[in-house]
Design a protein with these regions (language model features):
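Active-site-surrounding "flap" and adjacent substrate/cofactor-binding loops of secreted or lumenal enzymes
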Residues: 77-84
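Well-ordered alpha-helical segments within folded domains of soluble proteins
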Residues: 98-102
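A generic structural signal for nonpolar/aromatic side chains embedded in well-ordered alpha-helices
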Residues: 68, 86-87
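Alpha-helical transmembrane segments of multi-pass membrane proteins
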Residues: 57-67
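Residues that form generic nucleotide/phosphate-binding pockets
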Residues: 36-39, 71, 82
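Membrane-interface helix-loop junction between the first two transmembrane segments
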Residues: 65-75
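Alpha-helical transmembrane segments
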Residues: 50-57
Length: 254
């Protein structure tokens, strides 16, 4: 089964929904998609600083790839193996979380929860688009398949050449960014970022990715979540629904 089936199922239901909240969410989702597609065309001078910092972070981590791989593989333990094996199911859990959050909010008529689910799905979709495109374009060999961090085979769909960037990490940081922006409670913020960081570390520990893959994935996810959270459709106030009051008219009979 497709690992992202829960999210695809959710999007299908959202786009076919006919209730008032779903119609509103459908229009907001279309607005988000349109703006996300044209966002690269609006790149301007203020974007150069975060871009430069991101490229510097990825480049710097590249020179630490082998050291971090050696350190992580030389310090494996049976207990840590069991703990970090959980990342195997993370993508399915993340996709299901987005869908379940949305439909719970819809069923409970909870606007904030419903919109959180929609934002999680939008962030998931945005980072996945960037992540899958880069994997195909870069074609970097995974550490488990080769011995060098500079082995590239662009436009290769083989799993062994889909190392850059880390998809698990980009997913984790996209969801963490949305959750952190959605809550004022410091405990939830710390939990979200801590779990995202643990997912990133697990990919290195399990020898699935180089450090620079994880750094790139974290940055992609973070900026995807920030874009979603700042989008105009996600910063507006809840709509006001007017419920008609039933009137009773009595006519006295003489």
């Amino acid at each position: 089964m497709n690992r992202r089936f829960p999210l695809l199922f959710f999007l299908a239901l959202l786009l076919s929904g006919s209730s008032f909240p779903q119609i509103q969410d459908k229009e907001d989702f279309k607005s988000f998609l349109g703006d996300a597609l044209i966002a690269p065309a609006h790149f301007d001078s203020k974007d150069f600083i975060p871009l430069g910092v991101s490229l510097a972070a990825i480049s710097g981590s590249y020179f630490l790839d082998h050291q971090i791989k050696t350190l992580s593989q030389n310090n494996r333990t049976p207990t840590a193996d069991k703990i970090f094996a959980a990342d195997k199911y993370f993508v399915e859990i993340a996709a299901s979380l987005s869908a379940l959050t949305y439909f719970y909010g819809l069923a409970a008529e909870n606007y904030k929860t419903r919109r959180l689910g929609l934002k999680l799905a939008e962030a998931f979709l945005l980072q996945a688009t960037a992540m899958v495109s880069l994997k195909f374009l870069v074609g970097r060999e995974r550490p488990a398949s080769g011995t060098s961090n500079d082995s590239f085979n662009p436009f290769n769909t083989s799993w062994a050449f889909t190392s850059f960037p880390s998809g698990h990490t980009s997913t984790a940081f996209a969801l963490a960014s949305v959750i952190a922006n959605d809550t004022d409670q410091i405990g939830w913020k710390i939990t979200a970022w801590s779990l995202a960081s643990a997912i990133g570390f697990s990919r290195i520990y399990n020898n699935e990715h180089w450090l620079s893959d994880v750094v790139a994935g974290a940055l992609i996810g973070y900026f995807a979540g920030e874009f979603v959270s700042a989008h105009k459709s996600n910063t507006q106030s809840p709509p006001v629904q007017i419920t008609p009051i039933p009137l009773s008219v009595s006519i006295p009979l003489n």
